[in-house]
From Swiss-Prot:
Quaternary structure note: Myosin I heavy chain is single-headed. Dimer of a heavy and a light chain. Inability to self-assemble into filaments.
Keywords in alphabetical order: Actin-binding, ATP-binding, Calmodulin-binding, Motor protein, Myosin, Nucleotide-binding, Repeat
Full protein name: Myosin IA heavy chain
Start and end residues of each Myosin motor domain: 12-720
Record-level GO BP terms: actin cytoskeleton organization; actin filament organization; aggregation involved in sorocarp development; cell motility; chemotaxis to cAMP; endocytosis; endosomal transport; lateral pseudopodium retraction
Length: 994
């Protein structure tokens, strides 16, 4: 079983709340508190991780910690965000199912940091090929880029996400990231034009102002932060810095991240120019026009600067802000006229344009990231949801309403999958179970999204009526929901608030601005202005139309519901999102996104991280009991603890259980083809013989349930051991197969090489045979021995000296390092006194050596060189015309070499071939005479050849004492050689095997 070395000095409380001795809310709170005080910010409730924001660096992240958690089960190791990431990754690999990690909690609870640690872990444990590294780097670098454009300092969090993000990482079959996709939700674009006192605008604005060089500041017409209306609005002193955030360093990181995701320098410049233009838009002020019924821009120079940054005409910019083009009529009767805007209307248009430009720019950056990690194939994914937490402010508007709505739906998922579905599953499977009560927030979700009578539906309907306003909207809400358990109206003289009783508590919403923000109106004049820009970025972001998924069946149901409930047909029709005459409302678009998100989450195996904000002061390790208790309550942690405490830590269908563990059972291996349930019973029966787990296991109708992790550890250990054994066996068989395959291939190669070498030898022998024929045919009588040429003879090393170290060393010393022995044989030499002397002949690739053997000496020598003749010194070689074996090598400016050998044909043929190669094709000269004149050490000498019919006496001087073909006898000044008649000179050499 895998083990983990725990730090006993940090053994505070219990790591898993299921192990609490006393199960109560107070003991749960106390356990979280004492662990948090000791810096132990992670605690689990079975598979659910509870994470508490420490507000300081703890040193519990990095490669060392990653290695500790890699491949470990959550039961084996202390709870950690890495453990959740590893569990999701292992499940994706082993089960082949999509996974999602849902991180929830209120603003400032540490959700964004948790998501970054998850990304870091996945990047660290996966492959390192060039493409995988590129994808991982892009995914990691997308975080600082999105934080720059989507995060801001709020009263509760210095790095608060002001948008929602669902990051899907797609993996290939090898388990490495091959791409991904980011979906963003509801950017808080109203922050661009207005922030609460003590808060900041989006980080990127301060990064741009603080991190730009002097040249960039001049290029983009940048000012100091306190000179921008959009950065100081509603803030008496302005808030331009944030603890723990360095805007100058952040700007460098943002630029680098842009480069990584494919935003090049020219595009970066357009983005920064657009950001500067957005800030300067806020400084535009308007005066009443001379006619008094319109408005004009008060600072034309500023308008020119903005127009220059945006690549538009300054006059058209002013016209688009201070007037609207209205079209009436249809077809040929359509007419267009300009309507002047009041100062207030012009300011509204200015702010709407700034918000829309920034929002579209943010969407563009998300698209650029997605393009850089896009994959065409469909694979398994791990999704990480980092979405804004539940928010309750002094003034809660449309943004908080949407944020709390999505948190309400996420809470419903948690309830469905961890409390409701789990208990229902026990009942359906026939498992003995005592129900645990919990708070179901479905009624609150229905209050917001139900059709046709839900807050979002009524809001969209009210936006359709020209006379609709915030007051008529709240009147309608009070009318329809006055008796709803999750809705309350506020009894005040000015009725501008309503209350929703969320799972996290009651929230007072201010209706002011709801309709405007839902309509999200941007006049066509401003869209036309942007699309006429010389800046390609502005044109692209304003022309881009996001895809909208519309379910035709749901659309028909919506239309029918409106008709049945007495709403006007026109209103019903215009509410349907496919009606191009009406813009899609922000609320409707957000609801569609939430629906799509829920569909994705429900299609995955979920993992939960519940984040808790310990205090509102953002102080390290400070514990606010009431605040934490409130979060524990609305997150449903105690109810989750009760279900997990009484429930089962593991459940799986019989078929999937068999697929994973069938190899460890004697009766189920190597293949189980019977009923899966029967197989599981047999397998667990064998396990029960080893340890008593009868009380730990229950069998449902379709699933097996295991209460505690110990049997799982045993199962996994057995499986790992079995897999190792099988891997060893497979490896052994594979090695044997590979070895045999290698042996057979080697054997075949040897045979092929041998055959090829034999073929080459035959070809060379045939060539040499033909060469010998060209030398001797019609020039010299032949004897039977000389015309029979064996293939082995042409190898030439008759004395087997090629591997003799002394011979090799001597030849290299005499001739040079390139000397190679080509021929060695025994010969007879005719001395100056015409006596026959024994010699050995060595031929290299450029020299002839005659040697005489002697007794081996201590230095290894065993012969002496008597004569050294370079090929270049050979003048010619002479032979008789008879069938003898004598020949003379005539040497330039030296005495000649008179030799005799019965291997004359092979020697001369090979020598002729080597001579020609060494002297660049020069042919060796051969002479055939009845007598041969030559020079020995004493002077001129001669070989005289006499053909005789028979040989009656054997001369002691004969080189071939036992040869019947010729004899040699020394005379005074010559050597007489008597030769029997031989074969015809026309006889051809033939090849024999031996």
């Amino acid at each position: 079983m895998a083990t983990f070395k725990r730090d006993l000095t940090k053994n505070v409380g219990v790591e898993d709340l299921i192990m609490l001795t006393e199960v109560s809310e107070s003991s749960l709170h106390e356990n979280l508190k004492i662990r948090y005080k000791e810096g132990l910010i992670y605690t689990s409730i079975g598979p659910v991780l509870v994470s508490m924001n420490p507000y300081k660096q703890l040193g519990i992240y990095g490669n060392d910690q990653i290695n500790l958690y890699k491949g470990k089960h959550e039961f084996e190791i202390p709870p950690h965000i890495y453990s959740i990431a590893d569990k999701a990754y292992r499940a994706l690999r082993s089960e082949g199912e999509n996974q999602c990690i849902i991180i929830s909690g209120e603003s400032g609870a540490g959700k964004t940091e948790a998501s970054k640690y998850i990304m870091q872990y996945i990047a660290s444990i996966t492959g390192s090929s060039t493409e995988v590294e590129r994808v991982k780097k892009t995914i990691l670098e997308s975080n600082p880029l999105l934080e720059a454009f989507g995060n801001a300092k709020t009263l509760r969090n210095n790095n608060s996400s002001r948008f929602g993000k669902y990051m899907e990482i797609q993996f290939n079959l090898g388990g490495d990231p091959e791409g991904g996709k980011i979906t963003n939700y509801l950017l808080e674009k109203s922050r661009v034009i207005n922030q609460t006192q003590g808060e900041r605008n989006f980080h990127i604005f301060y990064q741009l102002l603080k991190g730009s060089s002097e040249e960039e500041k001049k290029t983009y017409n940048l000012l100091s932060p306190d000179q921008y209306h959009y950065l100081t609005r509603n803030a008496s002193n302005g808030c331009f810095t944030a603890d723990g955030i360095d805007d100058q360093i952040g700007f460098k990181q943002t630029k680098n991240a842009m480069k990584v995701v494919g935003i090049d320098e020219p595009l970066q410049k357009e983005i920064f120019a657009t950001l500067s233009a957005i800030l300067l838009l806020g400084n535009l002020s308007f005066n009443k026009s001379a006619s008094g019924n319109g408005s004009v821009i008060s600072d034309k120079k500023l308008a020119n600067t903005i127009a220059s940054l945006m690549g538009v005409d300054a006059i058209v910019l002013e016209s688009s802000l201070v007037s609207r083009q209205i079209s009436t009529g249809q077809g040929a009767r359509i007419s267009t006229y300009s309507v002047p805007q009041t100062v207030e209307q012009a300011m509204y248009a200015r702010d709407a344009f700034a918000k829309a430009t920034y929002s579209k720019l943010f969407d563009f950056i998300v698209r650029k990231i997605n393009q850089s990690i896009e994959v065409k194939t469909i694979g398994k994914v791990i999704g990480v949801l980092d979405i804004y937490g539940f928010e309750i402010f002094e003034n809660n508007s449309f943004e908080q309403f949407c944020i709390n709505y999505v948190n309400e739906t996420l809470q419903q998922i948690f309830i469905d999958l961890t409390l409701k579905t789990e208990q229902e599953e026990y009942v359906q499977e026939g498992i003995t179970w005592i129900p645990v009560q919990y708070i179901n927030n479905k009624a609150c979700v229905d209050l917001i999204e139900k059709k046709p009578i839900g807050i979002l539906s009524l809001l969209d309907e009210e936006c359709l009526f020209p006379e609709g306003n915030d007051q008529t909207m709240i009147d309608k809400l009070n009318k329809h929901f006055s008796n709803h358990t999750h809705y309350s109206k506020v009894e005040r003289q000015k009725n501008s608030q309503f209350i929703i009783n969320h799972y996290a508590g009651k929230v007072f919403y201010n209706i002011d601005g709801f309709l405007d923000k839902n309509r999200d109106t941007l006049f066509n004049d401003l869209v036309t202005l942007a699309t006429s820009s010389s800046c390609s970025l502005l044109v692209e972001i304003f022309k881009y139309v996001p895809p909208l998924e519309v379910d035709p069946e749901q659309e028909k149901k919506n239309r029918d519901k409106f008709s049945k409930n007495g709403f006007a047909n026109n209103a019903a029709k215009t509410f349907i999102p496919t009606d191009k005459k009406r813009p899609i409302t922000a609320g409707f678009q957000f609801k569609n996104q939430v629906t799509s998100l829920l569909k994705s989450l429900y299609s995955c195996s979920p993992h939960y991280v519940r984040c808790i904000k310990p205090n509102s002061n953002m102080r390290a390790l400070e514990w606010d009991q009431s605040k934490c208790a409130e979060q524990v309550a609305y997150l449903g942690l105690f109810e989750n603890l009760l279900v997990r405490r009484a429930g089962y830590c593991y459940r799986q269908t019989f078929s999937k259980f068999m697929r994973r563990y069938y190899m460890i059972g004697k009766s189920t291996w190597p293949k189980w083809s019977g009923d899966a349930e029967k197989g599981v019973n047999l397998l667990m029966g064998e396990l029960t013989q080893e340890i008593n787990i009868k009380e730990e296991v229950q069998y449902g109708k379709t699933k097996i349930f295991i209460r505690n992790p110990q049997p799982l550890f045993l199962l996994e250990d057995k499986r790992n051991k079995r897999l190792n054994d099988l891997a060893t066996k497979i490896g052994s068989v594979w090695k044997m197969y590979k070895q045999r395959k290698w042996y057979l291939r080697t054997l075949a190669a040897i045979k092929i090489q041998r055959t090829y070498r034999g073929w080459l030898l035959v070809r060379e022998c045939v060539k040499l045979k033909n060469q010998s024929i060209s030398i001797f045919q019609n020039n010299k009588e032949r004897n039977r021995q000389s015309i029979k040429l064996s293939k082995a003879a042409f190898i030439g090393d008759f004395l087997s000296l090629t591997r003799d170290n002394y011979t090799t060393a001597t030849l290299k010393r005499e001739e040079g390092p390139n000397a190679v022995l080509q021929l060695s044989l025994n010969v007879s030499k005719v001395s100056r006194h015409h006596k026959i002397q024994k010699r050995s002949l060595l031929v290299t690739n450029e020299t002839i050596f005659t040697i005489t053997p002697h007794k081996p000496k201590k230095d290894g020598s065993w012969f002496a060189i008597k004569r050294k003749v370079p090929f270049s010194a050979i003048e010619k070689i002479s032979f008789s015309k008879l069938s003898d074996d004598f020949f003379v090598i005539h040497i330039i400016n030296e005495h000649d070499l008179c030799l005799e050998t019965n291997k004359k044909t092979v020697l001369i043929t090979l020598l002729s071939n080597l001579y020609s190669k060494h002297l660049n094709g020069k042919e060796l000269v051969f002479e055939f005479k009845d007598s041969i004149q030559y020079r020995n050490q004493k002077g001129p000498s001669e070989l005289k050849f006499v053909k005789v019919d028979s040989i009656h006496e054997k001369s002691s001087n004969s080189p071939q004492a036992n040869s019947p073909s010729f004899t040699a006898k020394a005379e005074k000044n010559y050597l007489k050689v008597c030769v029997l008649p031989g074969l015809s000179s026309e006889s051809k050499s033939i090849l024999i095997e031996k």
